[in-house]
Amino acid sequence: MISPAWSLFLIGTKIGLFFQVAPLSVMAKSCPSVCRCDAGFIYCNDRSLTSIPVGIPEDATTLYLQNNQINNVGIPSDLKNLLKVQRIYLYHNSLDEFPTNLPKYVKELHLQENNIRTITYDSLSKIPYLEELHLDDNSVSAVSIEEGAFRDSNYLRLLFLSRNHLSTIPGGLPRTIEELRLDDNRISTISSPSLHGLTSLKRLVLDGNLLNNHGLGDKVFFNLVNLTELSLVRNSLTAAPVNLPGTSLRKLYLQDNHINRVPPNAFSYLRQLYRLDMSNNNLSNLPQGIFDDLDNITQLILRNNPWYCGCKMKWVRDWLQSLPVKVNVRGLMCQAPEKVRGMAIKDLSAELFDCKDSGIVSTVQITTAIPNTAYPAQGQWPAPVTKQPDIKNPKLTKDQRTTGSPSRKTILITVKSVTPDTIHISWRLALPMTALRLSWLKLGHSPAFGSITETIVTGERSEYLVTALEPESPYRVCMVPMETSNLYLFDETPVCIETQTAPLRMYNPTTTLNREQEKEPYKNPNLPLAAIIGGAVALVSIALLALVCWYVHRNGSLFSRNCAYSKGRRRKDDYAEAGTKKDNSILEIRETSFQMLPISNEPISKEEFVIHTIFPPNGMNLYKNNLSESSSNRSYRDSGIPDLDHSHS
């Protein structure tokens, strides 16, 4: 009999187990079978669903429904009862209209990569707390957005409409928008009212549209007082836009347009701008003082423009040399005229800008590079930056040293081709230097494609080996002194020299001995010895091989003569059949081999021969011949009985 205390213990244990298992069973039943639920995160993505499954827990906060086949009919009406849901991922589905029946308090909605064509006020008014709306890669057009569709979206901060069918910026956007992405559409015009009132807008992306200067209003961006980033990449602008908001703009992207001029007031009052990119345009010069108001500029990128380093660009060199170290300027490489092509504007001396009215004394430093004697000058190449002095002794005299500025440093360069793809550069310095910038460029190639190569060498070095060059190609080598602050001296002139790499054939210095050897085929003294040794080894090997073959052939012939037997029709005299004939040997077969066993040469006595008459038992024939009743020697041989020992009964 069970005691009352023990009964109470068992009852309490069962009740405890029930309350522990009950929540698990309820939770298991509340999660749809095709989904996975994890603390408010419902994972129903990538399951080829055509509708949103029912039975989603009421405490769900994030719904992952992307990469399915859900259409508008597949969104159940009870979905709007999930009041705790804040994020819904419905991208890459089969929606063709803006979905309804969404939870009221959703804040982040991802609908990209569908086929949504219309946006109505009815659909947006049901989710008034929406903050982020992603509609990239759909079929939304300007006329398919209902007028006033966003008038109740007072919390909307991010609106992404990239890669749609928009031809203009949608009107009536809420003032709360901070980021607006309209890239890769068909927008060709932007009127001032389009962006009017978007005082909270911080980032505006208009890349990949059809915008030109005529399609932009005079002050279309001027009222965007909080705009920090403006991107107009991959459009059809021919001039930099003006009247930009100068209060907060920090990043301006204008690359990949057709800009060939910059108005003098384009960047006025942009004192907060720290990044400006105008790469891949058609700029050849810049108006003087265009960057004067850019007090906080740290990144200026101007790559792949056809810069003409004439007198109009001399101010750029002076401005570059006055910049602090923190300012990073890229892409100011001369494309013309030919004499300075491939050189950095920062490296050019005042004489190279050809400013005739500037009053600059055209004094040329006589300490130039020693020409490469192995490479003749060619008329079609541009003249070097500095001229070769018409003196035999390259060593400077006292008078020649005083022709330039006393602070000017002298460099003497010598270039020698070592191999078809290597040149040796050596130099001498008249005064000690901290560092030098060494650069080389293949002539006839645009430096915009990376043909120019630069390196920094310390002042203690006096030579440098350049490898991986193209054989039989012209190159220009330049050297410029540098200070420790990484700024060039104002009066420093780059010293350049032109050379050519050797052809692909073996490079030989032009000495008298080599000229004599060129008349004869090239001979290497080490090759005959190796050839003699190799030939001797080959001859010995061939002789040994021939000897072995002869020996095998000779022994094989004798062996064949002693052991050969006829492969044709056998005759009764070919074998010593059943030991009844006198022979010197008997063919003994052992499994798969045979052996010749000699027998005594003494004649076998006739008394040992016994002829047995074979009588078939019970009148049975010893063989069966289907073709003929007559006997034949072949039939008997097939039966295993010798021909001569067989007799009929």
Swiss-Prot record:
<feature type="repeat" description="LRR 9">
    <location>
        <begin position="248"/>
        <end position="269"/>
    </location>
</feature>
<keyword id="KW-0472">Membrane</keyword>
<feature type="glycosylation site" description="N-linked (GlcNAc...) asparagine">
    <location>
        <position position="282"/>
    </location>
</feature>
<feature type="repeat" description="LRR 8">
    <location>
        <begin position="226"/>
        <end position="247"/>
    </location>
</feature>
<dbReference type="InterPro" id="IPR032675">
    <property type="entry name" value="LRR_dom_sf"/>
</dbReference>
<feature type="repeat" description="LRR 4">
    <location>
        <begin position="129"/>
        <end position="150"/>
    </location>
</feature>
<feature type="topological domain" description="Cytoplasmic">
    <location>
        <begin position="550"/>
        <end position="649"/>
    </location>
</feature>
<dbReference type="GO" id="GO:0099560">
    <property type="term" value="P:synaptic membrane adhesion"/>
</dbReference>
<feature type="domain" description="LRRNT">
    <location>
        <begin position="29"/>
        <end position="58"/>
    </location>
</feature>
<keyword id="KW-0770">Synapse</keyword>
<dbReference type="GO" id="GO:0007411">
    <property type="term" value="P:axon guidance"/>
</dbReference>
<keyword id="KW-0677">Repeat</keyword>
<dbReference type="GO" id="GO:0007507">
    <property type="term" value="P:heart development"/>
</dbReference>
<feature type="transmembrane region" description="Helical">
    <location>
        <begin position="529"/>
        <end position="549"/>
    </location>
</feature>
<dbReference type="GO" id="GO:0098742">
    <property type="term" value="P:cell-cell adhesion via plasma-membrane adhesion molecules"/>
</dbReference>
<feature type="disulfide bond">
    <location>
        <begin position="309"/>
        <end position="334"/>
    </location>
</feature>
<dbReference type="InterPro" id="IPR003961">
    <property type="entry name" value="FN3_dom"/>
</dbReference>
<feature type="repeat" description="LRR 3">
    <location>
        <begin position="105"/>
        <end position="126"/>
    </location>
</feature>
<dbReference type="InterPro" id="IPR050333">
    <property type="entry name" value="SLRP"/>
</dbReference>
<dbReference type="GO" id="GO:0005829">
    <property type="term" value="C:cytosol"/>
</dbReference>
<keyword id="KW-0130">Cell adhesion</keyword>
<feature type="region of interest" description="Interaction with ADGRL3">
    <location>
        <begin position="38"/>
        <end position="67"/>
    </location>
</feature>
<dbReference type="GO" id="GO:0005789">
    <property type="term" value="C:endoplasmic reticulum membrane"/>
</dbReference>
<keyword id="KW-0217">Developmental protein</keyword>
<dbReference type="GO" id="GO:0005925">
    <property type="term" value="C:focal adhesion"/>
</dbReference>
<dbReference type="GO" id="GO:0051965">
    <property type="term" value="P:positive regulation of synapse assembly"/>
</dbReference>
<feature type="glycosylation site" description="N-linked (GlcNAc...) asparagine">
    <location>
        <position position="296"/>
    </location>
</feature>
<feature type="region of interest" description="Disordered">
    <location>
        <begin position="629"/>
        <end position="649"/>
    </location>
</feature>
<dbReference type="GO" id="GO:0005911">
    <property type="term" value="C:cell-cell junction"/>
</dbReference>
<dbReference type="GO" id="GO:0003345">
    <property type="term" value="P:proepicardium cell migration involved in pericardium morphogenesis"/>
</dbReference>
<dbReference type="GO" id="GO:0014069">
    <property type="term" value="C:postsynaptic density"/>
</dbReference>
<dbReference type="GO" id="GO:0007416">
    <property type="term" value="P:synapse assembly"/>
</dbReference>
<protein>
    <recommendedName>
        <fullName>Leucine-rich repeat transmembrane protein FLRT3</fullName>
    </recommendedName>
</protein>
<dbReference type="GO" id="GO:0048598">
    <property type="term" value="P:embryonic morphogenesis"/>
</dbReference>
<dbReference type="GO" id="GO:0043679">
    <property type="term" value="C:axon terminus"/>
</dbReference>
<feature type="repeat" description="LRR 10">
    <location>
        <begin position="272"/>
        <end position="293"/>
    </location>
</feature>
<dbReference type="GO" id="GO:0042803">
    <property type="term" value="F:protein homodimerization activity"/>
</dbReference>
<dbReference type="GO" id="GO:0005886">
    <property type="term" value="C:plasma membrane"/>
</dbReference>
<dbReference type="InterPro" id="IPR000372">
    <property type="entry name" value="LRRNT"/>
</dbReference>
<feature type="repeat" description="LRR 5">
    <location>
        <begin position="155"/>
        <end position="176"/>
    </location>
</feature>
<keyword id="KW-0812">Transmembrane</keyword>
<feature type="domain" description="Fibronectin type-III">
    <location>
        <begin position="405"/>
        <end position="504"/>
    </location>
</feature>
